[in-house]
């Protein structure tokens, strides 16, 4: 995919409409654009999924054999393999160039050996994966970095996903702080209507939503004018009013952006085969692809600079009918010694990488407004699991794939970094990866994310990934 020149695109009427929200932002703040996308796969990503041929050779093919986990052979100090053909890994072939698609191998970094046993591992670590803390004990990295990245976007973060739960909103993966879970929209039809409702349905729908906020705001203002209760109750009303005013302001901003975002919208739920034909229970991968469509529009349209896509992490017994019918993720993992199950597990991880690669290529083909390069240059995409390296994880290892963000200082140039295994002096932790993202977000003092306490091995970012 060839990136259009900024001059050619922006001179066209379509280009002006398409990038109006980003042009507005660039004019408002002359700072380098920065974005973050985090993708989680539920219930484990096995290290072999990300092990390139070069990394296998470096560690000793005979030492690994057919093992799917092999941290025992990791080096005593971090080993960086540059110019690595990461697409040779079992589940990373979607990064290779094919059928007119650009290669993303030279835009990627694979990290093996990072640990985070403070989270507890298990089937799922809940908010632990993104907080480097005990489940429910701290804010997750998306919530911490979103305010730093938001700038003029109407949404600080968009959180989407899939789940085996029957509810359309779940709360187990992201958190604003201790015991303050953040909602994730796990039904793509609801996500579409919630995010794009007033944009997709036109000015009338937007006016109706604004009128509802105006009515509620006037009602609270009238109550406050005559309120004689205690100060705590008054504070609650004042916070409610502030929330309504924020929502009303966002609705007005969305209305101003509608014309430029409408051409980017994915198919409406009733017309989208990924939603309409997903079955019951829905094929999690079809719904996830629909959520990726929504996320892509949000990024291209300037609706947010922070996205979380949580695949089954808040209810992990999801189904993948397009890959292996009738069996849920939990039973699939328990039967991993069955060749068909292992093949399916690898195919599921590979599908996640394919969806990530599609997003990355779209961003790579889109010129950044207000800075040089493409949107991918200014967007860090991180793919990892919600519990570590296997079905019943201890948090001993969290394989990770990082794409893009080279303009933010990330060394995503086609490298694999292998860290010593947990328990070794030079092991590094997932919190170091998140510290790296904090530095990439522009905060040079972001060095102690996570609640490891005395078990923290080292502060700061990963020097092999950032600098």
Predicted regions and their residues:
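Ligand-binding pockets and gating/stacking loops
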Residues: 2-467
């Amino acid at each position: 995919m060839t990136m259009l020149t900024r001059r050619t695109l922006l001179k066209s009427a379509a280009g002006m409409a398409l990038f109006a929200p980003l042009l507005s932002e660039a004019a408002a703040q002359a700072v380098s654009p920065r974005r973050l996308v985090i993708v989680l796969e539920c219930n484990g990503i096995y290290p072999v999924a990300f092990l390139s041929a070069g990394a296998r050779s470096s560690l000793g093919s005979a030492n690994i054999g057919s093992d799917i986990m092999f941290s025992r052979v990791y080096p005593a100090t971090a080993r960086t393999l540059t110019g690595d053909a990461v697409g040779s890994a079992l589940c990373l072939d979607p990064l290779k160039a094919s059928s007119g698609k650009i290669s993303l191998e030279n835009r990627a970094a694979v990290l093996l050996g990072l640990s985070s046993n403070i989270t507890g591992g298990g089937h799922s670590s809940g908010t632990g994966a993104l907080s480097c803390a005990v489940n429910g004990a701290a804010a997750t990295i998306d919530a911490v970095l979103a305010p730093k990245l938001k700038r003029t976007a109407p949404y600080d973060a968009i959180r989407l996903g899939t789940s085996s739960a029957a509810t359309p909103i779940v709360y187990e993966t992201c958190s604003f702080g201790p015991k303050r879970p953040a909602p994730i929209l796990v039904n793509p039809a609801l996500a579409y209507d919630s995010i794009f409702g007033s944009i997709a349905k036109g000015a009338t729908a937007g006016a109706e939503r604004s009128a509802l906020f105006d009515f509620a705001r006037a009602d609270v203002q009238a109550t406050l004018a005559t309120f004689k209760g205690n100060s705590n109750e008054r504070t609650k009303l004042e916070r409610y009013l502030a929330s309504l005013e924020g929502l009303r302001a966002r609705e007005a901003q969305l209305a101003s952006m509608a014309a430029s975002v409408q051409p980017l919208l994915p198919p409406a739920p009733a017309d989208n085969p990924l939603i309409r034909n997903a079955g019951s229970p829905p094929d999690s991968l079809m719904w996830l692809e629909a959520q990726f469509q929504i996320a892509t529009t949000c990024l291209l349209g300037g609706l947010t600079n922070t996205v979380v896509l949580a695949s089954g992490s808040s209810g992990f017994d999801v189904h993948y009918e397009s890959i292996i019918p009738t069996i849920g993720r939990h039973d699939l993992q328990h039967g991993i010694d069955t060749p068909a199950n292992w093949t399916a597990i690898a195919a599921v991880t590979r599908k996640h990488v394919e969806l990530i690669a599609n997003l990355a290529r779209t961003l790579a083909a889109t010129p950044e407004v207000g800075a040089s390069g493409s949107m991918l240059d200014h967007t860090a995409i991180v793919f990892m699991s919600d519990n570590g390296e296997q079905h019943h994880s201890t948090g001993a290892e969290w394989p990770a794939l990082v794409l893009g963000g080279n303009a933010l200082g990330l060394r995503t140039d086609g490298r694999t970094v292998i860290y010593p295994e947990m328990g070794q002096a030079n092991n590094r932790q997932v919190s170091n990866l998140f510290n790296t993202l904090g530095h990439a977000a522009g905060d040079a003092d972001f060095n102690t994310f996570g609640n490891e306490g005395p078990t923290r091995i080292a502060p700061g970012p990963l020097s092999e990934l950032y600098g």
